[in-house]
Each structure stands twice: as structure tokens, then as C-alpha cells.
């Protein structure tokens, strides 16, 4: 008789308890078909997390298959803990982005902290040493107190974990819109460096080889976290705080160092982080990839308290844990290593030739499941989409109050400086950060070399909402431009697809069209997708977030020497590269003046992005440019103001655009600051002004003149978020 009191197989079926775990009737029937019998409580739990949206991608898998995943530099693409891309000299960059949206909505500090911890372990499980962190965040408007609380908690959680573990946070983006009220997005990205011959895989093979557990003892925190992440947020979500894991960065640091030492042992067969779905996903996925069976003895699993059942052990998402497969007879070598690092560890099972996933506790069988169907036969749903109807009436932008609009945009939290938030992150730990958070992509030196890795993370949610296909192209191109702007060669990307419920036709269509656009951009820009994540059901009280695909992209700088002089000075000339058109659909201007976004915009020219990017990168590397900035949210006038305020330099410029076009967000444009005495020889480049010692921001077109003290602009731009966070309801 079992020592654990659980519902019987019959009770599970009759009372449909499997529905509470996230399985539909059809999915339960498929489990019965696979097993040839009714599943027990532990088996239902295992199938429910492995077949959850978060783990199986059952609504998004068809779209992921269209992404290009191979390329000249790709060493390892999707399917492992992170992507691996060659950077020369037998070295590679390892990177991935993951979401932790639902947990952060319920418990913002721990939700964000464990998101950072989890993505770090993904990189470490490949065998790479992390060199920097990035994040992409979305919140509701800061006029709402709850959104202020969420922002403060998330930023504190990111800083609290990253700072303690000793990895700099070097770049990111934060946007605010009421569509994220109660449903923030927290996407964390990590980048690491590895030698080619040290790359590890999450595989279990070699009959008789041992399975080793290492890290924090298993508790009851995070049970059904993967299922929770696959549901819409409701009034009842607050009761699911136990589904939010608790992070311990100090143990995380020990685990990271121990893992990086363990990968040097020839006897290591495979390794995987215990992330979403905990011990269930790590062990079953390793068995599936190795074409093997596994027998886990759960009475050997280190636990935080007595009485934890097999069901709870398998579904717990206790943080800071790794699972290893090592050669038989070498177990003590690994256990001694982990003991040296003051980590709990134990041999909990072995690889078998049965092709079955068997769990026992005190020799009693609690699960006996065929490996391949569990890992590979989750149902895939192809649904019907429905095109969104656009507002065909034209918005009127002919009578804009330029000065008032300029100040309002500059102070909107989406555009305003994030300095107050970034200063809570350690940006320099490790002493290899060359370009810190601010205006550009980050640049981190590869230690011991002249090389550096540039990285950026970007999203364009309003544009994807307006025109999903074009918006999908746009978000990839934006990341590409941000790497070009620091002189890097874009190599590859990772993505995080954040959407509402795919069961709603309009949202499913957004998923179809935006991923198609992203795929096309990846092919033209030659930035294959090597890793990623999908987060669906981002809805609160029936209201969906904007469709928010986020792109993390890395680029290579072979020699960082030019960056020593990559800083603008008074006397430098300012060029605008690219044409400015009447592009207002999806823009900050449309949102500011009309309260919503629902107008189409012009398509993006990807071939032009490539040719223009090559010329600008060449100008940077040849020492002609002292700063390059992509023209982004808020348009040309706002972009110029941000450069002036960031560098405390005066600026004088004459712009050949209309009043409304000062705020147009036409894609594919750059501001290139050229060193005094140099010229920019690019067809689409137009000299528009210069930087000055005078602390005046003096910009005009044929109709209006904006003349402000740089200090006033800086105060408005840098002080806006602080003011929002100190404003009481």
C-alpha cells in the first residue's frame, strides 16, 4: 500500500481531476491510449506539465518550424538549453531568452529573480560562462499604482539576482501601455562564452550510467509552475503564489562554478538545468534525446522536508538545480566536487535500455511511461485565424503643437531615460563591459582577446498589433540596426513570442502573420534563430496584451580598438541616413494624440537594411563615426534630443521635414555623428547639423524652432520615470 494518500485512477477519471492539472478530455484519452491503461496521479501530473503550452509549444510549434535555424556560424540550434554560434578562434557565443511573465505578475521580485536565475542556468548547462544579462520588460501605464509596484519589484528582482551572482546587466528595453495592466512581461536573456570542445548536451545515454541530482533540496515551491505559465491570469491567480519559485543567487553562484568545473570531467555524459517542470522535464527530455530509458529512485532525491510525494518531487520547480548523467563508476568524483562547493547532491537513478521512464519510491512504482510519446507526442493544435479590421479613416496630424508634443513624448516612460532603473543593476562586474545601458546595444569584451560581443533585445508590440506581418519583420530589423550602430556584425538571434490566447481567432492570426514576417527578415538579414521561448495566454480579465515578439540578437566585433574613440564631441557633424515619410500608424505620436493605435504603416525594405547596414558599419570601423543612433520611438526630434541629453552636448540642426514628420517613425533610419574633418559618403546620408560646446538644443525646420537648454531636456528625460514612481494616486 502506498505511503502517500492520492486520488485513485478511477477518481481521477470520474471527477475529471486531470482538468485541474491542465489536460483536456481528449488529451487525457490520448494518455490512456499511450499507456494502455488509466494513468495514476503522478503520471497525470507528468503528462500535464510536459504537454502544457509552456513545455510542448502545442499551439506554436508549426510556426517555429518556419524559422531558419542554420547558417555559416551556427554550431547548435534549437533543441538544447541555448543556441551556440561560432565567433572564431575555437570560441563560441551561447545565448537564449526566456519569459517569466505569469510568476512576475503574482510575485514580481521572485518572479523576475528566478527568471534571471533560470536563464543563467540554461547558458551554464551548455558549459558556457555567462558574460552579460539583458531584459525586455512591459508594464501597464505608471499612472496606476499596481503597475508602479510591479515595476519596482521586477527591477529589484533582476538586480538582486544578477548583482549577487556576479554577472553584469548591460542592456534592455522597457515599455509601458495599458494593454499590459496586470500582465507584465519579463523576458530575460543571457549571453555566455565557451570553447568549441566544451559544448555540452542534455542527453542521457549509456546503459548503466548514473543520474546525479545537484543543487537546492527539493521543496514544494513551484509545483505546476509550467501549467500556471500556460493559463490566463484571473482573479484566482493570486492564490497560485506557491507556483512562484524562490531564488537563491548565492547557491546559484556555487552551482554555476561547480557546473563549469564538472564539464571539464571526461566522464560527464550529459547535463540539463531543472527549469520549467523541474525534474520531470529535465530527466524525460534527456532520456528522449539519448534514445534511452531512465529509472529514477525518488527516495534518493534530496528533499527540504519529510513527506514530499513522488508527484510533488517530479513537479516541483525548486530553483538552483541541475541533473547530470555520468559514466558508471565515476559518481564519487562528481559528488566530491559538489561537496567541495557545499552543494547537496545524490545519485538518484540510472540509464536503462527499456525506453521507459520509470519512477520508484522505496521500490514501489509510481510511474511507468514510454519515453518518446511523453516527450514528442504532445498534441499539436492548428486553429483558425481571423484578419483584424483596420481603421481606414486618416488621422489628422496637420496642426501639431510641436513643442508641447516634443516634451510630452520625451517624458513618456516608454521613451524617457531608464537610468533610474538601470543604475540598480551592476553593469561593470567582471570589468569587461565596454558599452553600458543607455542609448545603444551593449558591448562586452571576450576576456583575453580583442574581440567583443554586442547584444541587444528589442520588441515592437504596437506595430505587430497594427500589421503583424510587417511588425514581425520590423522587430528583427530593429535588433539588426542596433547591432550595426555599434559596428558589430549581426550573427544570430533568439526570440520570445509573447501573445494572448491562441484560441481567439484574431490572436492566432497575429501569431501566424508575425512569425511569417520574422522568418522572412531572418532569412534576408542572415540572422538564424538558434533558441527561443513561447509565452501564450498573456491575458488578464479577458483582455490580451499586445502581440509582443521579442528578439535578442548578438553580433561580433573582431577588434574593439575603434571603440576607444567612439564618443561624440563638440564640432562633430550630424547626418541623417534614410528617408523620412508620413509613418504614424503604430507610433508614439498616434498613441499620444488619439489614444489608440489602429492604422497601417509602410512596409520595411529588408534589402535596403542590409546594404545600408554594411556602409554604416564600415564607417564606424574606419573611425569616421563617433556615434550612431537608430531613429526609433518618438521619431527624429526625440532621437536627437536623447543624444544631446545623454552626452551633455549642445546641438544645432536644420531638418527638411514637416512638423508631423519630426515625430514620424519611418523605419531604417540612422543618426550618424561624424568626427570633425571627416565626411560620410553614403547615398542616403544628409548632413543636418553639428554638435556644439554651447548647452543649447537648437533644432528647426521651415516652420518651427525648438530651442531648449540641454540641462532642461536632460532633466525632463531622465527625471520622468522617477517622477512617475513618486507620484501618489
From Swiss-Prot:
Pfam families, per the entry: AIRS, AIRS_C, FGAR-AT_linker
Protein's name in the database: Phosphoribosylformylglycinamidine synthase subunit PurL
Family recorded in the similarity comment: Belongs to the FGAMS family.
Keyword field: ATP-binding, Cytoplasm, Ligase, Magnesium, Metal-binding, Nucleotide-binding, Purine biosynthesis
UniProt subunit comment: Monomer. Part of the FGAM synthase complex composed of 1 PurL, 1 PurQ and 2 PurS subunits.
Underlying gene: purL
GO molecular function: ATP binding; magnesium ion binding; phosphoribosylformylglycinamidine synthase activity
Reaction(s) this enzyme catalyzes, per UniProt: N(2)-formyl-N(1)-(5-phospho-beta-D-ribosyl)glycinamide + L-glutamine + ATP + H2O = 2-formamido-N(1)-(5-O-phospho-beta-D-ribosyl)acetamidine + L-glutamate + ADP + phosphate + H(+)
Protein task: Part of the phosphoribosylformylglycinamidine synthase complex involved in the purines biosynthetic pathway. Catalyzes the ATP-dependent conversion of formylglycinamide ribonucleotide (FGAR) and glutamine to yield formylglycinamidine ribonucleotide (FGAM) and glutamate. The FGAM synthase complex is composed of three subunits. PurQ produces an ammonia molecule by converting glutamine to glutamate. PurL transfers the ammonia molecule to FGAR to form FGAM in an ATP-dependent manner.
Catalytic-site annotation from UniProt: 54, 100 (proton acceptor)
GO BP terms in the entry: 'de novo' IMP biosynthetic process
Binding site for Mg(2+) 2: 122, 273
Natural source organism: Staphylococcus epidermidis (strain ATCC 12228 / FDA PCI 1200)
Residues that hold substrate according to the record: 99-102, 121, 245, 317-319, 535
